UniProtKB/Swiss-Prot annotation:
Alphabetical UniProt keywords: Hydrolase, Virulence
GO molecular function: deoxyribonuclease I activity
Catalytic activity: Endonucleolytic cleavage to 5'-phosphodinucleotide and 5'-phosphooligonucleotide end-products
Protein's name in the database: DNase toxin Tse7
Transmembrane segments: none
GO biological process, alphabetically ordered: protein secretion by the type VI secretion system
Cited function: Type VI secretion exported toxin that via to its DNase activity induces growth arrest and ultimately DNA degradation within target cell. The activity is initially neutralized by a cognate immunity protein Tsi7.
InterPro entries: Tox-GHH2_domain, Tox_PAAR-like
EC number: 3.1.21.1
Subunit structure: Interacts with Tsi7.
One Pfam assignment: Tox-GHH2
Length: 386
């Protein structure tokens, strides 16, 4: 049952909770038989599950329902379940373990117990650790909340993904990314590789449904051939750069990480090609209408730049998604909830001033025609975000 203790409107993870990190995939482990041509065993991906009841090294003095609470970079689930058949001597392909620990890779930015950040419902995990890194990619942490009950702003998208991806991992045994190509497409403007990849993805119901599930920049669950695109540009939140060395965040913004910020899985390795390029085109065209002004920085200084607000940039990014990915039909309620879930932790709200970023191509007419041509090829009906 839920323990009704929240941080940033998300339930805090504790040993007393019924929380799970479900079906993290793939946890690749060597599995018998061990014989030529696979003397180490057959490498097989397994779905993993971690349970809150296995919380270890939590809080010492603060309790929820009389039990310890998960903390940043200290606590973990002592066991993950699902990879037990991978019992060849080598075991996990990365960690040489099975049933390894589960660690969290995100947490509340501003709520702390015992001077450490608390972990919450829907924070991200990696599974089957001997020590960091784990064998599996991150997977959302689930607890007693609306997603568990099949409700919430993404309820329709969750149901659609389960239906359209029933045959694909983690629900089934097939790989949704199979057949998309050997690697990422060329980033040259003269190449149409990214467009061909976009056609393949748009024709697959599972991948178009999964487009609505925003991903961190890295690690993420996009197909290897795809590229994660920030819906709110990382550079919009800093004086220069994307938050690395030498970047100063705008006033009021803290603990932002470009690697953890929400992205859509797009096609194209840069801002000039494929659906990645189309997203930049529409978002940049909207940003170009912004007026120049002064933006205050967190260090007390200021810069002059075209400025907008987070709320406006969010609406523009969702509108761009509706144009570029009409097959996905992601609702604005679902996208908005996911974007807000992260950015509010960084001190950002709808009125927060940010930079209006213009990158990539600028020909909206050509971009619109490219989408119409693709839709005609796919027999799709063009639609915007609802």
């Amino acid at each position: 049952m839920a323990n009704e203790v929240y941080a940033n409107n998300m339930e805090i993870s504790c040993k007393a909770a019924n929380g799970k990190s479900i079906a993290a995939f793939p946890d690749v482990c060597f599995t018998p038989p061990q014989a030529p041509p696979t003397p180490l065993g057959v490498p097989i991906p397994y779905p993993n599950t971690g349970l809150s009841k296995d919380t270890t090294k939590g809080t010492r003095t603060i309790r929820i329902t009389r039990k310890e609470v998960m903390l940043k970079n200290k606590s973990y689930y002592k066991t993950s379940y699902g990879d037990e058949p991978g019992r060849a001597p080598k075991k996990g392909i990365v960690t040489s373990k099975i049933k390894g620990k589960v660690y969290f890779t995100s947490w509340s930015m501003n709520v702390k117990f015992e001077s450490k950040n608390v972990v919450r419902h829907l924070d991200l995990t990696t599974h089957n650790h001997a020590s960091f890194p784990g064998n599996t990619p991150v997977w959302p942490y689930l607890d007693q909340a609306t997603v568990d009950a099949g409700g919430g702003p993404c309820s329709n998208e969750v149901k659609k993904e389960k239906k359209d991806c029933a045959d694909f991992k983690p629900h089934g045994s097939k790989d949704a990314c199979a057949g998309l190509g050997a690697g990422k497409p060329s980033g040259k403007k003269t190449s149409n590789e990214a467009d061909r990849l976009a056609d393949k993805v748009a024709a697959r119901k599972c991948l178009t449904a999964r487009r609505c599930a925003l991903q961190p920049y890295k690690p993420n669950s996009c197909c290897p051939q795809q590229t994660a695109h920030h819906l709110i540009e990382a550079s919009a939140l800093h004086d220069k750069g994307r938050g690395g060395k030498g970047s100063v965040p705008l006033k009021g913004i803290s603990n932002y990480s470009e690697n953890k910020a929400p992205c859509v899985c797009a096609e194209g390795v840069n801002q000039n090609v494929g659906t990645h390029g189309l997203m930049h085109t529409f978002q940049s065209a909207a940003a170009a209408k912004s007026r120049s002004g002064t933006l205050q920085l967190s260090n007390g200084s200021s810069i002059s730049a075209k400025k907008t607000t987070y709320g406006t940039a969010k609406r523009q990014s969702m509108a761009a998604m509706g144009k570029v990915f009409p097959q996905s039909k992601c609702s604005k309620e679902c996208l908005s909830a996911q974007l807000d879930n992260y950015h509010k932790q960084c001190g950002i709200n709808a009125r927060t001033p940010i930079k209006a970023v213009e990158t990539g191509q600028t020909d909206v007419t050509a971009a619109t025609q490219a989408i119409k041509t693709r839709n005609a090829r796919l027999g799709a009906t063009r639609s915007r975000v609802r």
